[in-house]
């Protein structure tokens, strides 16, 4: 039953979200990650209401990088699909040269969240009750909820480690197969 009166937590047993930054700085301010920063109040409500949510934040997504080495493999396919993927990704990599030149590639933010939704073993998590700061200088910061630190039940997991080789290998295999078939 997906009636409007039911919440996500009632319909889905486990949720995975891409957003936040717990152990690293944000990407739109020293504290806030872009997705959470768009609506900190909504994200805070999600963290307080859902019982099993996994946060895939910058802590791990910036460890899963695509570089020009990967895009060269798509270009080498000689297919329109490979050329498109390479051009689009190279554009994204170039944007990172301005915003985060130290990374040497572009983060796979949303793809990693999808990967974890399919295979939670891709990441190492810590259990925590989360909140989002909704006011002041730290607005948009994802952090442990000090009012629930001692609660026995932890309602969130935050990814703090990622099996990047396994994730990148599967990501590249799937997209390369698609790009090769797109003629």
Could you describe each region identified by the protein language model?
Residues 1-8, 12:
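Single conserved hydrophobic/aromatic residue that forms the stacking wall/gate
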Residues 17-18, 54-58:
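Short, conserved beta-strand edge motifs with alternating hydrophobic and charged residues
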Residues 37-41, 56-183:
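Conformational coupling and interaction surfaces
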Residues 6, 46, 114:
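Aspartyl protease active-site motif detector
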Residues 6, 22-28, 62-66:
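Short, well-ordered, mixed-charge alpha-helical segments that flank or form enzyme active sites
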Residues 14-48:
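Active-site glycine-rich loop that binds ribose-phosphate moieties when present
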Residues 10-14, 50-51, 126-128:
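Short coil/turn connectors at secondary-structure junctions
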Residues 9-10, 30-32, 69-71:
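Short, glycine/charged-enriched secondary-structure capping and boundary segments
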